[in-house]
Amino acid sequence: MPKLKTRKAAAKRFRVTGSGKKIFRRKAFKNHLLQHKSSERKFRRLSGLSLVSEQDEANVRLMLPYL
């Protein structure tokens, strides 16, 4: 059986926790058009990582077979 291919775009966007059970992603809406967004919104609510929802986690794992 041939090796499974990893989707490279997904590999750059998702990381796994140390235990390998959960998948993290970067929060959206922080690339451009930032001048009208408040500091509280940009730095507190949009900073850091968040978990991928349970509904999407199965699709992400299919894209990244060797997580």
From Swiss-Prot:
InterPro entries: Ribosomal_bL35, Ribosomal_bL35-like, Ribosomal_bL35_CS, Ribosomal_bL35_sf
Entry's Gene Ontology cellular component terms: cytosolic large ribosomal subunit
Record has Hydrolase as a keyword: no
Superkingdom of the source species: Bacteria
GO molecular function: structural constituent of ribosome
Annotated keywords: Ribonucleoprotein, Ribosomal protein
GO biological process: translation
Family in the record: Belongs to the bacterial ribosomal protein bL35 family.
PANTHER family the UniProt entry points to: 54S RIBOSOMAL PROTEIN BL35M (PTHR33343), LARGE RIBOSOMAL SUBUNIT PROTEIN BL35M (PTHR33343:SF1)
Name by which UniProt lists this protein: Large ribosomal subunit protein bL35
Organism, as annotated: Rippkaea orientalis (strain PCC 8801 / RF-1)
Gene: rpmI
